[in-house]
Amino acid sequence: MHKKMIALDLDGTLLNSESKLSDFTIDTIKKISALGHKVIITTGRPYRMAHTYYKQLELDTPMINFNGSLTHLPEKKRGDEQCLTLDKKYLLDMVANRDTIQADFIAGEYRNKFFITDPNEHVADPKLFGIESFQPENQFNPERVTSDPNCILFQTKAEDKYALADEMNRHYDYNLSINTWGGPLNILECNPKNVTKASALTYLLDKLNMDQKDLIAFGDEHNDTDMLALAGHGYAMKNASSVLLPYADSVTDFTNNEDGVARQLIQLFL
């Protein structure tokens, strides 16, 4: 069988609503990998919030984090990894205008650290950042922002997160890629201009000498649109946002709480 690259979003797609992998999904992904297909976790999460799933699935393939800002082979030092950043001025500006965007919190995300405006468990769930509790070193302070972040993450009270993303993209003259993330949570992520899951997957396809038609992708949210459009075959989850549906070739028969990805992969390969 011709080998495929299978790009898998995590939240709302591979993970259930409790942010867990079922045993059925784990077993299925292992079988798919054993056939030689390249399973690529493709997520808005930083690596520290995705590595547990990578290990559970026993993957040895590259991973895409921060919606495309970081493409790397976990635990390995490789010269061909891609780590992209955005100008720190955008982080400082968003913090200065946090009331305008109705932000509960704003965080600057780096490969191995983050700074958050409100390190308070009543405002932000520490687990959203892959930790059990916030520490003093996580507190945002303009003086600490000495380097450019991989992305900016914030939660908003705005009723329509998609409209806010569009408004902010216009405000910053499309010098950023601003997308929604986090399934049902009102979370927006800001990445460097033209950086998306699709741009990272294009980079990987080139590195692995694979064709775009051999890419299969699964997603559920606005930040998966480019990825599904790029793929030879893009699947929107049964539980996907309606925003994603025009970009999908198919919709899975089952939701993320029903092992929708695993069941579709079994139909395709097992």
Where would I find each of the regions flagged by the language model?
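Active-site phosphate-binding/coordination module
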Residues: 21-123
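Conserved acidic, metal-coordinating active-site core of Asp-based
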Residues: 103-105, 109-218, 222
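Short, structured coil segments at secondary-structure junctions
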Residues: 57-59, 67, 171-172, 230-231, ...
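Short, acidic loop-to-helix structural element flanking the phosphoryl-transfer center
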Residues: 19-36, 83-90, 130, 134, ...
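Non-catalytic pre-domain segments flanking phosphatase-related domains
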Residues: 1-8, 27-30
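Mg2+-dependent phosphoryl-transfer enzymes with acidic/Ser/Thr/Gly-rich catalytic loops
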Residues: 1-5, 22, 188-270
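Short active-site oxyanion
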Residues: 36-40, 59-61, 150-151, 213-214, ...
